[in-house]
Amino acid sequence: PYLMLPARFVRNIGASVTGTTAAGLAGHSVGVVKGTVHEAMLAAFFPAIKAQPFDNKEALLTALKERKIDAAFADALQLSFWVASSASDKCCALFDGPYMSEHFLGEGMTIMLRQNDSVLTAAIDHALATLSRNGRLQEIYLRYFPYGLY
């Protein structure tokens, strides 16, 4: 995969969270969309954090913005866009992480090519590796995801 899609915490900047790691969220209200891989991952990775379930992402982010919860745990890509958007009213910031898990989040994003096109596959693999090594891939990520994924 050329892009892993991690989970992240986002916190309301008005919440008094101690420290800069997820351990500081113990005892705080942390929202998550119920029935999702993020709910299962939160329970598995952070058993000391009691999750507050929400029916959907919109309800979760509204509660976070209105400070009904101190933090949320969800898809890093979606959270990055939300934090950078006017919808967040600059209430919140990404916090700790990223958290990767092939078990919960899958293998990441890949580029699909014809199975028998080994020349094109090798060329794309080489180009992505070169971009990664010289820092250009990170530069491109930050252009489109200014708050980062990782």
Language-model-derived ranges and their functions:
Residues P1-Y150:
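Proline/Glycine/Serine-rich low-complexity intrinsically disordered segments
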